[in-house]
Amino acid sequence: MAKKVSAIIKLQVAAGSANPSPPVGPALGQHGVNIMEFCKAFNAQTDSLEKGAPVPVEITVFEDRSFTFITKTPPASFLLKKAAGIKSGSGEPNTKKVGTVTRAQLEEIAKTKEPDLTAADMDAAVRTIAGSARAMGLNVEG
């Protein structure tokens, strides 16, 4: 028989640096999950990613306090800021542009994000990422 799900916790944790301090500790502790076990497993799974990149993670906690987790790809905004070489997006994206991204960079980001996007094909995925770039105040070339 399948285990009963007790809770689903969604967090955004820096790759390779999960530790028991907030936000991880309190979120898992209130559901009785072994926090260190999660931290070790998460850090091992995100070793290949860029250290410090924010990684969304969905943790499924079962009634017997065991858990499974699924890591997603880093947010598009993080990848776009890295590609454009900026610290943050524009406060006024329609009037004040803060950087530029090329079509090739958008395609690279779309390839990275492909597992998490619901786009029908790669062109639609690139358009989705381009829309995110424009909303952040980035010029899109190409």
From Swiss-Prot:
GO terms for cellular component: cytosolic large ribosomal subunit. Transmembrane segments: none annotated. Keywords: Methylation, Ribonucleoprotein, Ribosomal protein, RNA-binding, rRNA-binding. It comes from the Bacteria. GO terms for molecular function: large ribosomal subunit rRNA binding; structural constituent of ribosome. One or more lysine residues are methylated. One of its GO terms (biological process) is translation. Forms part of the ribosomal stalk which helps the ribosome interact with GTP-bound translation factors. Belongs to the universal ribosomal protein uL11 family. Part of the ribosomal stalk of the 50S ribosomal subunit. Interacts with L10 and the large rRNA to form the base of the stalk. L10 forms an elongated spine to which L12 dimers bind in a sequential fashion forming a multimeric L10(L12)X complex. This is Large ribosomal subunit protein uL11. It comes from Idiomarina loihiensis (strain ATCC BAA-735 / DSM 15497 / L2-TR).
